[in-house]
Amino acid sequence: PIRSSAASDVYKRQFEDMVAYQEEVRDPTRIVEVLNRVIMNAKRASAPAQINIPRDMWTQVIDIDLPAIVEFERPSGGDNAISEAAEMLSSSKNPIILNGAGVVLSEGAIDASKALAERLDAAVCVGYQHNDAFPGSHPLFAGPLGYNGSKAAMELIKDADVVLCLGTRLNPFSTLPGYGIDYWPEDAKIIQVDINPDRIGSVSYTHLTLPTT
């Protein structure tokens, strides 16, 4: 944006519902400081963040020192919530696991979800456009939900009494009816696990939530 408070406000309003954090560079000598802060907030929220750089700064040459990105460790779900989730799953007659992008991005999460699925004998569905969130050759893999998804996956999750949602915010592309099948199990208990607590429960009602690292 150009250096104008009115223009800056317009840009902020355009993106405010799409990003977790916004900041504008006011002083070219502090651009790296601002960028560092924007990156940290994007990592903290596991979501996009926006930096606004006024046009008259684009061609400026400055001397800067590059600061280190500050790393941090996120808290994970509490013992009570984990115990409650374990009880829900162990007592379930028809549990289903739904893997999202977070499973792909988390080290070892695909193998962990595979081991859990085998222990529970639970079918595994994946979210829209996240077929890589579970091995396609595994006998418990049911397929993707949502647009052009798997009818088998939709039929299976429709009858679930507990759905363990891993690394997904349950957006409409993964929960809206497909092929005329209104498959999202409204009476099932939903356990949602995600790195960003702001996304938990924001799209679909959940019975138990576990923010994770």
Model-found features: residue ranges?
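Short internal beta-strands
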Residues: 52, 123-128, 191-194
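Structural signature of the thiamine diphosphate
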Residues: 15-66, 85-88, 154-184, 188-191
